[in-house]
């Protein structure tokens, strides 16, 4: 089954998933949204509002995170976890808040 993405381009499921992931990482300049490190090969997508807490796999609920940050955050509330980190940065917190949609921000 093909999946349509913007501009009418059709991709198979694997290609669509890869493109979806790459676009989010690219929009964040290939950097971890939390610690701002270069993602390199450790790129993951973190559900801002964890799936276990009702979060969806939607671009505005996903941010790139290095493997270390993603594992350490786990399903915790992102702001609470982020503010406890030595690398917390108000500018990055604002970027995350601007990225997530209002429904996600209210639920988090």
Over which residues does each language-model region extend?
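A detector for short metal-coordination/catalytic motifs
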Residues: 60-61, 68-108
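Generic anion/oxyanion-binding catalytic loop in active/binding sites
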Residues: 21, 51, 70
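Solvent-exposed, flexible loop/coil residues
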Residues: 5, 52-53, 82-86
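Histidine-centered nuclease catalytic patch
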Residues: 34-64, 76-80
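Short, charged surface segments at domain edges that flank catalytic/cofactor-binding sites
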Residues: 1-31, 90, 97-104
């Amino acid at each position: 089954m093909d999946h349509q993405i913007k501009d009418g381009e059709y991709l198979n499921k694997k290609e669509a998933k890869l493109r979806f992931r790459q676009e989010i990482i690219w929009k964040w300049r290939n950097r971890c949204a939390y610690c701002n490190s270069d993602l390199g090969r450790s790129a993951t997508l973190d559900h801002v509002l964890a799936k276990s807490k009702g979060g969806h796999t939607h671009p505005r609920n996903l941010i790139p995170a290095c493997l270390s940050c993603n594992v350490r955050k786990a399903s915790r509330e992102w702001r609470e976890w982020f503010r406890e980190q030595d690398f917390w940065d108000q500018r990055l917190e604002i970027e995350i808040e601007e990225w997530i949609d209002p429904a996600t921000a209210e639920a988090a």
